[in-house]
Amino acid sequence: MVRRKKSKQACSKGLNQRLKEDRISQFYESLLCQILNYLPTKDVVKTSVLSTRWRSLWLLVPSLELDSRDFSDFNTFVSFCDRYFDSNRVLCINKLKLTISENEEDGFYLKSWIDAAAKRKIQHLDVQFLPQFHKIHFNLYKCEALVSLRLFEVSLDKGRIFSFPCMKTMHLEDNVYPNEATFKELISCCPVLEDLTVIIYGMDRKVFQVHSQSLKRFSLKRVSSFLHEVALSGVVIDAPLLCSLRINDNVSKSFIVNNLGSNDKLDLSILFGLWHFDETSVTSMRSSIDRFLPGILSVMEMTIHSPAFMLMYRYLALIPLPHLPKFSYMSRLSVTLGVSDLQFLPTFLESCPNLKSLIMESNSNSKRMLLNGNYHINFSSVPKCLLSSLEFVDIKSSILVYVARMKLVKYFLENSTTLKKLTLRLALRLQYCSAKDEIVKKLRKFPRISKTCQVGIVFD
């Protein structure tokens, strides 16, 4: 009797212990789904073996991320997805990411999956094809609840009419569009679109047009390694609410940008399809640059990369000083350049009469010039902004050899009448060596035309 009583007590104690250990299973279903939503899908599915309570719980998780490479073979992946999207237990799909690494010509499976997701009011869709461009015919036009869309290496169907009344974010990377109208329609059918990223396959020869009354941020990348073999069409951007524009394009020969305002930010790396920047080459593209510049002259902040800087300098050098186009609203300029480009900086700054802040960084040619000892620079003029508006100069001197660096610092200290602070950023390794002391001594000897100017050295 005593032994039986002890046995019951032991069983009761073990049961209580298990209940304590599995308190998470006592949570409300909605809370469990929220917890599972933070886990990778393959781990979420594994919870189905924990107990009867957990067997179908993963089907209620509103986010799904599936990669065909996580399955033993592609047929197993398709079979799993078919069962999932056909399940009556799946009531809501908020977010779906599909990564597919097989080249199935018809893509029959994807159409039914997207249809199923559309019926469940999917809001975030990400489809990636890894091996190559994939020709599919899935019904994007049915996904009217979409808020964000990402397509990677997808070949879109011809003649579809899209409607995305809720779409705010779109990322289109290396996709194939059957014609120019399809791309244009895809963008213009999003009346509340705010963020757009477009990465274009370098050899695509279409004119890409972005017309949007709601777009606020746009990033475009169109790059090819075979510049000498291409002669591609251009880009048209018309977005009156745009406040941030980033263009990295070495292929397009024509750019038209409308409606950039005085509060906008511009990140520019464009070559107008040129391989060389001699006077003859730049002159050949002058009409295209003439059409492009008026659309960006009102920007407040600009980042310009080399060799786009050299292209713009060569263009500006063709124009008499009184007729030089002016970035009158620009207050902040960040420029990437090499030692050989420094002598052209004053000419470029002539176009920025109200500039307040200037940041300079290096390009990959600077180290090569250091090894060659080729760093002769000569500043021939003092632009207006140095005499009336420039307040902050930040020189990231990994860009420069010692002589060039000190010439640049001396130039700004001697000529910037309104300068408040000049920051010289040095490599961290110089912090504890004698070169640092030599630089400090030099800086103290340089005359400063601005009595309020402070010089700071930062090691990073």
Curated annotation (Swiss-Prot):
CDD domains per record: F-box_AtFBL13-like
Species: Arabidopsis thaliana (Mouse-ear cress)
Residue stretches making up the FBD domain: 375-426
Gene3D superfamilies, per the entry: 1.20.1280.50
Domain F-box intervals: 21-67
Domain of life: Eukaryota
Listed name of the protein: Putative FBD-associated F-box protein At5g53640
InterPro entries registered for this protein in UniProt: F-box-like_dom_sf, F-box_AtFBL13-like, F-box_dom, FBD, FBL13/AtMIF1-like, LRR_FXL15/At3g58940/PEG3-like
